[in-house]
Curated annotation (Swiss-Prot):
Protein name as it appears in the record: Glycerol kinase
GO molecular function terms attached to this record: ATP binding; glycerol kinase activity
Keywords tagged on the record: ATP-binding, Glycerol metabolism, Kinase, Nucleotide-binding, Phosphoprotein, Transferase
Pathway the protein contributes to: Polyol metabolism; glycerol degradation via glycerol kinase pathway; sn-glycerol 3-phosphate from glycerol: step 1/1
Keyword DNA damage: no
Matches recorded under Gene3D superfamilies: 3.30.420.40
Length: 500
């Protein structure tokens, strides 16, 4: 009998990927395809939803070819996706009526300002666990309905569908038969009540979005639909697991118990802590979000978003040309023992959790005549760890959970110097797993559970393997001193507002 696999579709911000996993949770093969980014105005970011779809199809074909397996060896498909990115399409033609508005896009700032002025902040925060911010899907849907000719009329007539990227891909893979999303993605829209687990009529009224546009919301591990055979090499394969990228990473890191946390170091950083079956309302600028719905239970998480992390390293490479490649940052930073008092606050697009200060801009402090390129690079790396501590402290204050370990993933975790400093500044153990593609692995696990490929979460938890552990080597006195310097730098950055 031929070996069976789970296929994970990992649809990200700059590329789509298809990754094959075997029963041990190991990567068998992967394929990746980048797609075009559109920047029609400053601060706006858009994608072509059809190009995303064709990139996914290309990755599926490529990964099957590279692995030399047949489509009938795929037991189930999991989908994980860039969250909040918004697609609106015509129900009759299946064609998007506008480009996909990406999570990073700030084109709905005007709408957000109006909602705040109208006094809706508390209602939205109370029901969704989120803030009024262009980041989330609801204002993006409203923008499309308000700005695309004829869109509002078509929506009122029940002729338009809205979906996050998971919804769009399921719709296409199922041949237009299925319009669904999962709890984790729905919880990022600004339209979903995370307590009642329903689309909220009051929120829809505030945003002026017709309910007929919205997908059905289902658990994160369930057979939603089968692929139509003409999109999957003659096979009808169950699409059986869905989660937004950060929730999928939490699941892939096997953070199944209350109080377990992970940090993903990508373009930005996303720190999530499992808070169990009760949502925790944050008083410290964190988001309350749904982690997943599995085994008939919905579990929640606290989330902190750091806007600039890996992109600060890219800036050193592409903007300042201080390094030739991202890995070189570790070698350079290792040549000095400290930053010699230099702090870099990478508020290039404002500051995220816990500050939510969109007006802040990047700054460097503590420069002297003796400051070298090495100090500057080290300060940039350390800024990732300091921002993570900002979020972690907010989490501890909200949850009263004393975190002992942090599981990490994402591109920057290969940097041993950064991971050691992260452990030092947090005062906790940092664990780096063998399989670092935890986002794709999480969606594969969700799909595999639904089709019986894996028995339960206990079996999955045993597959999590630690590649390297970083233990705190810094005194509390030293870490506290360094962190106070960071806090002063952030305070100074936020107080500098230059009005042109």
């Amino acid at each position: 009998m031929s070996e069976k696999f789970i296929l994970s579709i990992d649809q990200g911000t700059t590329s789509s990927r298809a990754i094959l996993f075997n029963h041990k949770g190991e990567i068998v093969e992967s394929a990746q395809k980048e797609f075009e980014q559109f920047f029609p105005k400053p601060g706006w970011v858009e994608h072509d939803a059809n190009e995303i779809w064709t990139s996914v199809l290309a990755c599926i074909a490529d990964v099957l070819r590279k692995a030399d397996i047949e489509a009938n060896q795929i037991e189930g498909i999991g989908i994980t996706n860039q969250r909040e990115t918004t697609v609106v399409w015509d129900k009759n033609t299946g064609r998007p009526i506008y480009k996909a508005i990406v999570w990073q896009s700030r084109q709905t700032e005007g709408i957000c300002k109006e909602l705040k002025e109208q006094g809706h902040e508390d209602t939205i925060r109370h029901k969704t666990g989120l803030l009024i911010d262009p980041y989330f899907s609801g204002t993006k849907v409203k923008w499309i309905l308000d700005n695309v000719d004829g869109a509002r009329e078509k929506a009122e007539a029940g002729e338009l569908s809205f979906g996050t990227i998971d919804s769009w891909l399921i719709y296409r893979l199922s041949g237009g038969k299925t319009h669904v999303t999962d709890y984790s993605n729905a919880s990022r829209t600004l339209m979903f009540n995370i307590y009642d687990l329903k689309w909220d009529d009051e929120l829809l009224e505030i945003l002026d979005v017709p309910k007929s546009m919205l997908p059905e919301v289902k658990p994160s591990s369930e057979v939603y639909a089968n692929t139509v055979s003409y999109h999957f090499f003659g096979e009808e394969v169950p699409i059986a697991g869905v989660a937004g990228d950060q929730q999928a990473a939490l699941f892939g890191q096997a953070c199944f118990d209350q109080g377990m946390a992970k940090n993903t170091y990508g373009t930005g950083c996303f720190l999530l802590m499992n808070t169990g079956e009760e949502p925790v309302r944050s008083k410290h600028g964190l988001l309350t979000t749904i982690a997943w719905g599995v085994d008939g239970k919905v579990e929640y998480a606290l989330e902190g978003s750091i806007f600039v992390a890996g992109s600060a390293i890219q800036w050193l490479r592409d903007g300042l040309r201080l390094i030739e490649s991202s890995p070189q940052s570790e070698a350079l930073a290792s040549q000095v023992e400290t930053t010699d008092g230099v702090y870099l606050v990478p508020a290039f697009v404002g500051l995220g959790t816990p500050y939510w200060d969109s007006d802040a801009r990047g700054a460097v402090f503590g420069l002297t005549r003796g400051t070298t390129k090495e100090h500057f690079v080290r300060a940039t790396l350390e800024s990732l760890a300091y921002q993570t501590k900002d979020v972690m402290d907010a989490m501890l204050a909200d949850s009263d959970i004393d975190l002992k370990k942090l599981r990490v993933d994402g591109g920057a975790v290969k940097n041993n110097l950064l991971m050691q400093f992260q452990s030092d500044i947090l005062g906790v153990t940092v664990e780096r797993p063998v399989v670092q593609e935890t986002t794709a692995l999480g969606s594969a696990y969700l799909a595999g559970l639904a089709v019986g490929f894996w028995k339960d979460k206990e079996e999955i938890a045993k597959q999590w393997l630690n590649e390297k552990t970083f233990e705190n080597e810094m005194s509390e006195e030293e870490s506290s001193y360094l962190y106070k310097g960071w806090q002063k730098a952030v305070e100074a950055t936020r107080s500098f507002k230059f009005e042109s």
